[in-house]
């Protein structure tokens, strides 16, 4: 499988969850307080890089802990698990020649493009970024202000 094919197939699977994720992002945005410093979308791949991953939203700032607790499991935006018949949902398999690092970069990039279009257009007061929890991939700024060419800060 070529990188472009992998990206396209992954994006088509992500798109099936867009309605639910858009609603969750709106709820996350609406729950933010004046002390919220930003919203981070974490993409977590499994340690062996076989293909399972999760996409979670979290707050940054002094109120982060209480806000994250308030939203709870609704912070999970997307998840891939190994089921009885393979990946659930059926994301493409990692190309054999890719390392875990390569897979992680591609998944973060595809998720960032997908999430960018789902963030509420009114969410201009906060920075939004897509990254990995351990910071191994550079953060990608997303959201309505970024789409218009300027940073919210």
Features from the language model and the residues they span:
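N-terminal domain-onset segments
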Residues: 1-37, 45
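Generic structural hydrophobic/aromatic packing signal, biased to beta-strands
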Residues: 21, 41, 57, 128-130
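Amphipathic, interaction-prone secondary-structure segments
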Residues: 27-68
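Short, low-complexity, polar/charged sequence segments that are solvent-exposed and flexible
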Residues: 58-64, 76, 147-150
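Amphipathic protein-protein interaction modules
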Residues: 64-127
